[in-house]
């Protein structure tokens, strides 16, 4: 009887490894580059997230660009500042508003803010976002693999057969390290491992294109004249008294939107359907066990394909606290009614009984 066992991050956490997004990855990212982390947090994550699936669901879906424009707005606010030019009472020019005005305009013109240059100065780090996350993941998984080498798992609680096949969504070597009877040829690391391949992560293209606030022209809610949360709204004196044209600000706003669209599109996860199909197509699977996986919508295409290949298989999934989130994620999927939800202890009992 063929068994397919699908492992998520909960499998590593079950074995006591430091692979939590909030508790383990976030501190590493902050240590790597705290400024970039805070910027990305403001761009994509309105509030703290706990799960890796939440991270993938949000990455590439811009919430606000205020944090990108604030350095430029600060410079503009101090660009044309008459108060800074005011003459002291002892000066013969004290109270000469028009002279102060002209001095302020001259000073502003001499120190004119070049919008694109300032944006590049403050935000060039965004060009390395994917590598930033990859490096954080590699460091976290390296720590987890080192922990694997040090731990003594005399009581593993899980029985795997030599004939079991595995799909691991993890980047660690936990499965083959702790369960040496599992052949590496029976494992598909669908998103890579830190030892062998580039780590794969990201969001679905339809999430990024269809729900990126009002920043994307392919979004039906996009309105070029009303790009919420990203325009620099300029006081009229910047245009009247310094040689700025409204078109310069309009062009800057459009360039920022285009840049962010490009950045967001780079966050699309390349779904490895062909790779998974090649791994599975010659197997005869009767039972499917899903352990430690929250069934994030980003990864549902894999499960739809698994259902197509093995429509008669029984499905079981482990539930840590509540099944509500999983049920919401797989709502209206092909396999929605196939899944049987079991608390972790009951799930492992069933898995071991069918060993």
Regions inferred by a protein language model and the residue ranges of each:
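SIR2/sirtuin-family catalytic core signature
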Residues: 1-15, 263, 270-355
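An N-terminal structural lobe/cap that precedes and organizes the functional/catalytic core
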Residues: 1-39
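Hydrophobic/aromatic-lined pockets within catalytic cores
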Residues: 15, 30-33, 176-183, 195, ...
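Glycine-rich, phosphate-binding/catalytic loops in enzymes
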Residues: 21-25, 183-186, 306-308
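Short amphipathic alpha-helical segments and helix-helix/interface helices
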Residues: 26, 151-159, 176, 276-280, ...
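Short, conserved aromatic-histidine micro-motifs
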Residues: 30-43, 315-324
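Extended, H/D-rich, highly charged conserved domains that either
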Residues: 39-254
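Short, flexible loop segments at the rims of nucleotide/cofactor-binding pockets, characterized by
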Residues: 138-149, 262-269, 293-295
């Amino acid at each position: 009887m063929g068994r397919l066992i699908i492992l998520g991050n909960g499998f590593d956490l079950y074995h006591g490894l430091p692979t939590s997004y909030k508790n383990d990855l976030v501190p590493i990212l902050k240590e790597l580059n705290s400024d970039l982390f805070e910027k990305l947090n403001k761009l994509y994550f309105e509030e703290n997230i706990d799960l890796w699936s939440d991270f993938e669901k949000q990455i590439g879906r811009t919430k606000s660009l205020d944090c990108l424009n604030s350095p430029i707005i600060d410079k503009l606010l101090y660009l044309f500042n008459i108060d800074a030019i005011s003459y002291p009472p002892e000066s013969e020019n004290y109270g000469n508003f028009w002279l102060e005005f002209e001095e302020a305009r001259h000073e502003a013109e001499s120190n004119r803010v070049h919008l694109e240059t300032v944006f590049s100065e403050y935000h060039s780090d965004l060009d390395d976002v994917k590598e930033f996350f990859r490096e954080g993941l590699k460091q976290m998984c390296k720590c987890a693999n080192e922990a694997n080498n040090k731990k003594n798992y005399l009581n593993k609680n899980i029985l795997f057969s030599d004939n079991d096949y595995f799909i691991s969504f993890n980047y660690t070597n936990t499965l083959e390290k702790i369960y040496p009877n599992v052949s590496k040829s029976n494992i598909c690391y669908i998103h890579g491992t830190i030892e062998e391949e580039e780590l794969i992560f990201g969001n679905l293209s339809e999430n990024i294109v269809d729900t990126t606030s009002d920043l994307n022209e392919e979004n039906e809610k996009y309105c070029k004249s009303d790009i919420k949360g990203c325009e620099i709204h300029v006081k009229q004196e910047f245009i009247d008294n310094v040689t700025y044209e409204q078109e310069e600000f309009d062009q800057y706003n459009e360039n920022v939107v285009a840049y962010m669209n490009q950045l967001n599109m780079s966050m699309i996860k390349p779904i490895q359907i062909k790779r998974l199909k090649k791994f599975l197509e010659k197997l005869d699977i009767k039972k499917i066990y899903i352990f430690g996986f929250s069934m994030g919508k980003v990864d549902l295409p894999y499960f739809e394909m698994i259902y197509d290949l093995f429509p008669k298989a029984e499905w079981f999934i482990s539930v840590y606290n509540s099944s509500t989130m999983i049920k919401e994620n797989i709502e209206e999927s092909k396999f929605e009614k196939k899944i049987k939800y079991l608390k972790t202890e009951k799930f492992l009992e069933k898995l071991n009984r069918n060993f």
